[in-house]
């Protein structure tokens, strides 16, 4: 991607997205449900263990703490997302994780490249010296009037895409971007107790090939990014989770009246 011409501009084919949005509307009750399936329970906050095997448990503990913070900070009517919020989320997610050249809650100061040949190639994140400017523009864009007119799911997926595009941290960009998207859904009235509808599993199934391939297609097209296919893919994942909530609610109702 050619960074000197980068802008927060995108296009969406509403006609192609109509079936996805209709499926989303069909499960709207589940989006605001207060009773959620047991597999959405938070992992307990644990005392940090020692040794190499500690990393997955530390990530789980940190994710729980970060989700708690996001859930308290972002509610309908709360103040818009800020760069300070993003840095706090990253700090909470990265606590006690030893990552070379990274201080939790700070933007990277070195170049970064991500990707794989089998998933479309490699992507260079925003130039480090431009990150403070790009991140300021990012929060202005995400908190602006235009994204707020879109359905909440699309708004959150825009936030995810552009965050991943900038890749502002050495590590933890995926986890942070999903919680940024979660924050937007919270503000727009969704109950996302599980953290962006557990989209991590959906995005990264089959080694994340489809997810990364769609991202690279968008990046290779350049500005304005055609996000139709990526947004459709993301909505599919949200609908999949909402269906499981609907099934759970129906089961609870049957038991209540049975």
Q: What is each residue range found by the language model?
A:
Residues 1-258:
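FIC/Doc superfamily catalytic core
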């Amino acid at each position: 991607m050619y960074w000197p011409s980068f802008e927060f501009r995108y296009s969406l084919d509403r006609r192609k997205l109509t079936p996805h949005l209709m499926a989303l509307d069909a499960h709207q009750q589940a989006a605001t449900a207060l009773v959620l399936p047991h597999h959405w329970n938070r992992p307990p906050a644990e005392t940090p263990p020692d040794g190499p095997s500690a990393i997955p448990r530390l990530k789980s503990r940190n994710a729980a703490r970060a989700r708690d913070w996001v859930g308290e900070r972002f509610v309908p009517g709360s103040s818009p997302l800020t760069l300070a919020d993003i840095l706090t989320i990253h700090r909470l997610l990265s606590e006690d994780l030893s990552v070379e050249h990274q201080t939790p809650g700070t933007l990277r100061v070195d170049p970064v490249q991500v990707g794989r040949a089998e998933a479309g190639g490699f992507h260079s994140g925003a130039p480090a010296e431009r990150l403070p400017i790009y991140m300021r523009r990012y929060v202005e864009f995400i908190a602006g009037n235009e994204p707020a007119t879109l359905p909440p799911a699309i708004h959150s997926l825009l936030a995810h895409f552009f965050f991943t595009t900038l890749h502002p941290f050495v590590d933890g960009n995926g986890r942070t971007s999903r919680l940024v998207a979660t924050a937007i859904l919270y503000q727009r009235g969704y109950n996302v107790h599980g953290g962006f509808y557990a989209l991590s599993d959906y995005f990264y199934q089959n080694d994340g090939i489809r997810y990364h391939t769609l991202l690279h297609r968008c990046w290779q097209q350049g500005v304005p990014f055609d996000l139709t296919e990526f947004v459709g893919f993301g909505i599919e994942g949200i609908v999949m989770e909402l269906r499981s909530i609907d099934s759970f609610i129906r089961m609870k109702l049957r038991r209540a009246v049975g």
